[in-house]
Structure formats: C-alpha cells, structure tokens
From Swiss-Prot:
GO terms for molecular function: glycosyltransferase activity. It is an enzyme of class 2 (transferase). Pfam families: Glycos_transf_2. Belongs to the glycosyltransferase 2 family. It comes from Bacillus subtilis (strain 168). SUPFAM superfamilies: Nucleotide-diphospho-sugar transferases. The keyword Transferase applies. The lineage of its organism: Bacteria, Bacillati, Bacillota, Bacilli, Bacillales. Keywords: Exopolysaccharide synthesis, Glycosyltransferase, Transferase. This is Uncharacterized glycosyltransferase EpsJ. Induction: Repressed by SinR.
C-alpha cells in the first residue's frame, strides 16, 4: 500500500529529543503515513532508538548511512519515499497531531504542489508563534509565485523546508534534491527551485510545527569553521538559479540586502567568535570583505537603505570603509550572532 505522506526525519546527535519527535508523528490524526528515519552516522543512540520504534510500528522505516550531512540525509529519504506527498521534520523538533492531516486536506482539495503553515519557536522558557511569510488562506498561482521570488529573502518564505508539504510529483518533475555540497543554511536554495516549479501553493495561518531552539545543535555552536565555505556555496547556487531563470536583475537587490542584514553579520560574528589571535581575526575580517558575495552586497546596498535597521547600517558602513578594528570591536562587544539559528 502506497502511503499518502512520507515524513523524512534526519537524525544526528538528537538522542535527547528523538523520542518526542517520533511520538508526535505517531500521534498524527492522519494514519496513512510512512516515517523515514535517516541515521546520518550519528555517534549517539538515536539510531538504536529508531530501530526500537520500527519494531513497534510498521509505518516506520530506518535507514543507516555514513555521515553525509543534513542535505545527504534528506536526499536519502527523498529517494526512499513512496508517498504522494513528502514532508520533513528535524529530529530535535516535533509537530502538532493535526499537522499532516491539515496539510494533506488542503493539498488534495486545492490540487497544490506545496502547502505550508506557521510554526512555533520554542525555547526553554517561552513559545513564540511565527506566521507564514506568504499571504495565507488563498491559492497562489505560478505567475504569482514568480513575482514572490523577487522578494524571497525579504519575506523569508524560502527558509525552512519543515513547515511545508511537497507533492512528490514536484520532485520528479523538477529533479529536486538538496545540494549536498552545502552544509549550512541548506533550505533556501532548495526552496527557490521548489517554489519556482510549483504550479499552485497555499499557506495556512496555523501553528502546526514546533521548532526547538536547541543550544546543542550545529547551528547554535558559537564558532563554525566551515560557515564561510558553505554560505559562499549557497550564494553561488542562488546566483546560478537566478541566471538560469533570467531573474538576476529582478532579484539582485533582494539578495544583496539579505546578505547585508543577515549573512554578513553572521560571517563577521563567526570570525570574532573564533579562538584565533586578534591579528588573525582582523585578517579573517579582511578576507570576508573580499568574498564576491560580500563585495557585491556591500557595494550595491546603500547604508541608508530603508530595509536596514540602525545596527545593520552601522555594520555596513564599517564594511564599506573597511574598518576592521572597529568591526572586530563591534562584534566582540555585541557577543551575539545576528540571524536565525536554523536559518535557511
């Protein structure tokens, strides 16, 4: 029997959370599902826990593989999926019991390629609702989505694949897979392609997914040595996408402002969080300012741009003037990284 929905759950160092995640999937009011748990070479007991669950419920399938990263684990799940629809859940998150029933109902009734929802951001002491970043409760057609792509970074609707349900035919039609060379902020290049190919899209203003702010996750580690490499690969993938579809001119400002508001501060904060000497940190800042993605964004975004906040304007001005000492001082004083922890 072919399931209606395949739910792909990558697992890597999620032992404290994976049981709550799987339990939330087993409580779905939609029973016609398969749960594909992909053990991405995790060193903890997540794989063993998954196998125990698989013995108890035939809807669960466990795949073990050598560590290849989140994109690799998701691709493994996509290739194994049999459902009419495909959804993604991170192993340290969990979902509402009604999530997949609500999404499939809308997809079936409206012949949707993609249907999405709002989500809750949960920390240790609070839960905050994040609504959809596209107009909710009406079907968006392909021409409308093409127009939305021009503002994809401003609205952030391309962040996070786990708040969406995708028709499997879309993967086959567009040969959709995650770029396995990108190991940080993987979701947005994938979603650019997915939404470009989708014929019909709809958002529900309902909080059906709970994203846990996990201080032990990769995205929360203060210093990430590979961040620069993977953000540059992400940038190159986006530029290739825009060029392929003739969208470079229309989308350039959106991408440049996004880099100035989010990725440039992330790169600089990451450099200042490194254990290197002050001299090496300033050298790294100069290197970041030489990246093509940064040069283009800094050159073409005026610091008076209406979308920039005061602190973002200050950082941009310091970068335009290449004041590495003040950049270093700013981020050391600030002590936090701008941007979303699970930014896509």
């Amino acid at each position: 029997m072919i399931p209606l929905v395949s739910i792909i759950v990558p697992m890597y160092n999620v032992e404290p959370f994976i049981e709550e995640c799987i339990d939330s999937l087993l409580r779905q009011t939609l029973s016609d599902i398969e749960i594909i748990l992909v053990n991405d070479g995790t060193p903890d007991r997540s794989g063993e826990i998954a196998e125990d669950y698989a013995k108890r419920d035939a809807r669960i399938r466990v795949i073990h593989q050598a560590n290849g990263g989140l994109s690799s684990a998701r691709n493994t799940g996509i290739k194994a999926a049999r459902g009419t629809y495909i959804g993604f859940v991170d192993g340290d998150d969990y979902v509402s019991s009604a999530m997949f029933q609500r999404l499939t109902e809308e997809a079936e009734q409206n012949q949707l390629d993609i249907v999405g929802c709002g989500f809750y951001k949960q920390s240790s002491d609070r839960r905050t609702y994040v609504p959809p970043q596209l107009e909710a409760n009406r079907v968006l057609t392909k021409p409308e989505m093409t127009e939305q792509l021009k503002h994809a970074h401003e609205t952030r609707f391309i962040w996070y694949v786990w708040r969406y349900l995708y028709r499997r035919e879309l993967f086959e039609r567009a040969n959709l897979l995650f770029d396995e060379d990108i190991r940080f902020a993987e979701d947005s290049p994938f979603n650019l392609s997915a939404f470009r190919e989708a014929e019909r899209v709809k958002m529900l203003d309902e909080g059906l997914y709970i994203y846990r702010e996990n201080p032990n996750s990769l995205t929360e580690i203060p210093y990430k040595p590979a961040m620069d490499e993977h953000l540059q690969k992400q940038y190159q993938a986006k530029i290739a996408f825009y060029n392929h579809y003739g969208l470079a001119g229309a989308c350039k400002e959106d991408l440049n402002v996004y880099i100035c508001r989010h990725q440039l501060p992330m790169l600089l904060a990451n450099a200042c969080a490194s254990p290197n000497s002050p001299k090496d940190i300033k050298k790294k800042i100069r290197q970041i300012l030489s990246y093509d993605m940064v040069r283009q964004a800094v050159r073409h975004t005026p610091f008076q741009h209406e979308k920039l906040l005061r602190g973002e304007r200050l950082v941009l001005a310091l970068c335009k003037w290449r004041l590495t000492f003040l950049i270093k001082l700013f981020f050391e004083q600030r002590g936090t990284m701008k941007g979303s922890a699970k930014q896509a």
